[in-house]
Every structure is written in C-alpha cells, then in structure tokens.
Amino acid sequence: MSDAAEAILDAAGRNVIAVGFHATTVDAVARDAGVSRATVYRVFPGGRADILDGFLAREVERFFSDLYDHVRDLNDLEAVLVEGLTYARSRIIAHPVLNVALVEDSSVLESTFSKTIESITATIAEFVTSYLPTSPHRAERGDFLARMALSYLSAPGAWDFADPAQVEALVRSELIPSVSSGKRVSKVRPRPLPKAENTTLQQRVARALQKEFVSGGSLSMESVARSAEVSRATLYRAIPGGRWQLVGATVEIETARILSAVAAGLNDARSLDDAVVGSLTTIWHHAATHPALTRLLAVRPDLIHDQMRFAKAQRNFEVFTAQMAPLLARWVGREASERVAEWTLRVMFSYWLDPAPSLDVTDPASVASFYNRHLAAGVDALAALPDQRRVAAVLGKRH
C-alpha cells in the first residue's frame, strides 16, 4: 500500500474515532491527511465508501493478526480456544474503531465482512485443525470450530466472556467436549408450516409482497397495495417505511410460521436429541426452500447477514432463544435449555447463510449425521452444566 493510501486510511481512522462513521467525509479525511481531494479520489476512486471499506479491512486484518500472535505458541486446543476467545472479545470491546462501529451501526462492517469472512474462516479453520487428532472428519471439525469461534466473537449470546469459568465451560461443552456421546440419533422429518392466513392486514400485505417479490415484480408500494387490495395510506399506516421495511415485516411473519412448525415438533419430540435434530431439520428445510427467503438471500443477502452479526445478532439470539428454550425445559433445567436453544440457533444460522459441502441442510439424514458428529456430545455437556443462577440464588440465601 502506498504512503498516500496509508496516510488517508490513518486520517479516516482519526475521523471515525472523533465523529463516527456517518459524519466522516472525504473533505475532512483529505484535510486531516494533508492531501488534496484529487489525491484521495486517485487513490480511492469510490470516494468515501472505498475509504471506509479500505480502512475497516485494514483494521480487521490487524485485529486477527494480533489475535494469531497472541495464541500461536499455545500447546493445546483448549488453551487456544479459551485464551483466544477471551482475548479477542476483550479486544473488540476496547478497540477504538470496531467498538464505534458496533455502537453506531454495525451495518458499516457488513461490506468488509462479506468480502473477508470466507478467508478469515478458512485461516482460523486451518490453524485449529492443526491441533486436532487425525480422523475422517478432521477438516470438517476445524471448519465447525472456526465458524463457532467467529460467531461468539460477533455475538457472545448468554455467555459472559469476562468470566474465565464461563469461557472454559463454553469451550468444554460446545466446542471440545471431553467425552464423545457415542449416540446415533436418527433423522427427523421436517414439520410443515402452518397454513398462511389472510385474516389481518399485516398477513394480507405479507402475502401480497411475497407474490410480488418472488415473481420479480417492481416491489413498489403501489403494486403491493394493489395486490393486497388496500390503499397506499392504509399500507403506510400498517407498516410505516419503504419497501424494505415491508420485506422486514414479511420476514418476521414467515419466521413466526417457521417457529410455529418448530414448536409443533418440540411438543412431539421424545428426547432432547430428537428435539434439537428436529428443530434444525425443520428450520433449515424451510429457510432453504421458502421462496421469499431464498430470493431475499439471493438479491439482498446483506439484509440477512447484518441481522446475524454483532449487536443485532445478540438481540435476535435473545428473542429466538426466549421462544425456543421453554419447550426444551422438560428435559433440562432452565439455564441449560437456554444454552442448548441458543447454540442450536447459532449453528443453524451459520450453515444456512454459509453452506458447507459436508452438510445438506435440506436432507434430514445429512442433518442427523451432522448432529451426531458435531453436536450430540456438546448437547450432553450443556445439559450437565450446573445452573449458575440457581447456585447463586442458593448461596445468596445462605449469606
């Protein structure tokens, strides 16, 4: 990278820290870097967007390089994962730029991550795989660990990464459980979606929008209102905002239908293993075959990816876990049910948004086999964890 480019990116960093991403301008960056606007546009033809992309890409590269330097001399995988996750989370929180992005608007990181996440995942997978024993699924396991590690760095969920005991429990249960379960859970058929209703205005709008969206229509407010047989004014009152707000509302309705199908499966499950396998099978099947969701992932993947990273992912994990966990509590305690539900959702989103050659999310047999290889032992370990909130309550009463 040229000296001019480095100076411009350094200036961009100072501006971001001072005024935030949205208030950073080309003029301010040029003035801070001591160069002309013409020089800025010669080095970064795309202007502000290129500058911020280049700056964030550099910061992300430096972040992971620093993380690698911190763990590369450790001798075993558990130490690598515990120390690496703890250090990385603390660095994200303390990082003057990444923290600004997370607080202000994590969507500014989406372009950078969409361009670099594949190479970052592959690099982490290669590193952790070197610690794994030789086995038929060694590379696949390394990829799984890399995916999970990046997911925790983005959104820790219910795990407190400032508590060393919790990080160790996470690693020993979800990532490298000490004892293989030896179980072979059978495949579970996906549950059908409940019938799509048209009794409310929101449901009619959702049906109309899906029709327009899937068919490749203009997706204008006029066409959606016409298809839903309502006026534009009524449409705006029901779902304020533009067309992508309509898409978001439709996704929420369809997500609720998928969760209803999951709940039906959980009610009929005979064991915790059946419950998790059935939930993954049902969610993956509908997420991968639903016409509106598949088209949205094809034309605006950023809208979905952005919801599954950083603060937005944290919020979504909390919402979805709160809906799923109570249905798992008949097998395990409340805290364990929340851990299992969150992990199930974390795995589901990772392999739906970034498919792996080792898993066909639409094939129940493939899902069950994946569960047996990567999740069964971890679910057992999570179920065996003590309920820390209950322990704390008991200790509090004693004192």
Stretch-by-stretch model annotation:
Residues A4, S36-R37, S231-R232:
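Short coil turns linking two alpha-helices in DNA-binding domains
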Residues F64, V108-D143, I304-E342:
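Amphipathic alpha-helical packing segments from all-alpha helical-bundle domains
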Residues S90-A94, S130, L145-A162, S173-G182, ...:
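Amphipathic C-terminal alpha-helical segment
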Residues A28-D32, V40, S223-S227, L235:
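Append "Primarily bacterial transcriptional regulators
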Residues R89-K115, H286-A313:
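Amphipathic alpha-helical segments used for helix-helix packing
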Residues A18-F21, Y41-L52, F213-S218, Y236-V247:
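HTH DNA-binding helix-turn interface
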Residues D3, A7-R14, A18, D32, ...:
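Alpha-helical structural segments
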Residues M1-D3, S107, W159, A169-T200, ...:
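N-terminal intrinsically disordered/low-complexity leader segments
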